[in-house]
Amino acid sequence: MIEPALVALRFAAAFGCGLMAGLFFVFSVAVMGALARIQPPEGIAAMQSINRVILNPLFLTVFLGTALVCFLIALTSLWRWHEAGAAWLLAGALLYLVGTFLVTMLFNVPLNNALDAATPASPDAARLWADYLSTWTAWNHVRSITSFAAMAALMAGLYLQARG
C-alpha cells in the first residue's frame, strides 16, 4: 500500500504536467501561428509582452513546482523500484524534467532573452523574427509532447500502484 502523501505528490505532478502540456499545446497550435501572420515588429513586440506577462506567480508555481515534484518522484521511484508502476513514475518524472524543464531552460529561455534584447523596428527584425519563430516553436513542440507524455506516464504509474 502506498502512502497518501505519495499519492498526492504523484497526482500533483500529473496535474502540473497536464497544465503545462495544455499551455504549450495552445502556443504550438494557435499563438505562434497567429504571431507569424503579423508584421515582424508587431510580432516581436507582442511576444516580448507575452514573455514578460507569463513570468507571474501562478505560472512559476506550476512550472517550477511541477519540476520539484517530478524530481522528488524520480528519487522515490528509484528508492521504491520494487513497487508496481515505479518505472512509469520515473519515466514521467524524467520526461518532464528533461523534455520540458531542461528544454525550456536551455533553449526557449535563451531565445526569449535574445528576443527581449531586440529592437522590434530594427533592420534585422524580419530575419530575427523568422529565426525565432521556427526555432522557438520547434522546441515548444518538444515541450508540449514531453509534458503530455509525462502526464500520461505518471497517470499510468498511479493506476498501476493503485491496483497493487
Predicted regions, residues:
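Hydrophobic alpha-helical transmembrane segments of integral membrane proteins
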Residues: 91-113
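Interfacial loop at the N-terminal end of multi-pass membrane proteins
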Residues: 7-8, 19-64, 110-134
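Hydrophobic alpha-helical transmembrane segments
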Residues: 61, 131-148
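Structural signal for membrane-spanning alpha-helices in multi-pass inner-membrane proteins
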Residues: 24, 70-77, 104, 154-158
